[in-house]
Regions:
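Acidic, metal-coordinating helix/loop segments flanking the phosphotransfer/catalytic sites
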Residues: 33-53, 93
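Conserved acidic carboxylate
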Residues: 11
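Receiver (REC) domain active-site loop signature in two-component systems and cognate sites
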Residues: 60
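Acidic catalytic/metal-coordinating carboxylates
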Residues: 36-39, 64-68
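Active-site residues of response regulator receiver
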Residues: 57
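Alpha4 helix (beta4-alpha4-beta5 surface) of REC/receiver domains from two-component response regulators
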Residues: 67, 74, 78-79, 87-106, ...
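Charged docking surfaces used in two-component/phosphorelay signaling
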Residues: 18-26
Length: 129
């Protein structure tokens, strides 16, 4: 099964965002970028139906990852979310227990880990459809 799609990368740190985008493009994905939570919400308001997956940074200035999720829920915008963070998965699962998170990805991550995570989330989404 071929799993490709449009991925939104939400990351305020430019080097991390560029690295993530380059890895996803290397894996064959088309990528949109947002430098903060406000831009991410704007992109999703206009293109949520096209976006297959969002990689969302947990900690950003302005709107945090948690605030972005809360706003998307208020607006009824749904997209599978992989939360990215330097924090460990267990603490993130506790903190984000009230939100729908498809998976967690601890930074720094390697190409193989990103590939496995993204493809697993997209495969689960395809099976649910």
């Amino acid at each position: 099964m071929s799993l490709a799609g449009l991925v939104l990368v939400v990351e305020d740190e430019d080097p991390v965002r560029r690295y993530t985008v380059s890895l996803l493009e290397e894996l064959g994905f088309t990528v949109l970028q947002a430098i903060d939570g406000i831009e991410a919400i704007e992109v999703l308001r206009h293109r949520s139906g096209e976006i297959s997956l969002m990689l969302l940074d947990h900690s950003m200035p302005g709107l945090s990852g948690e605030e972005v999720l809360a706003e998307l829920e208020r607006e009824g915008l749904t997209v599978p979310v992989v939360l990215t963070s330097g924090y460990d998965r267990t603490s993130l699962e506790r903190r984000f227990a009230g939100h729908e998170i498809a998976d967690y990805l601890q930074k720094p991550f390697r190409l193989e880990t990103l590939d496995e995570t993204v493809r697993a989330v997209l495969a689960n989404r395809a099976q649910a459809s």
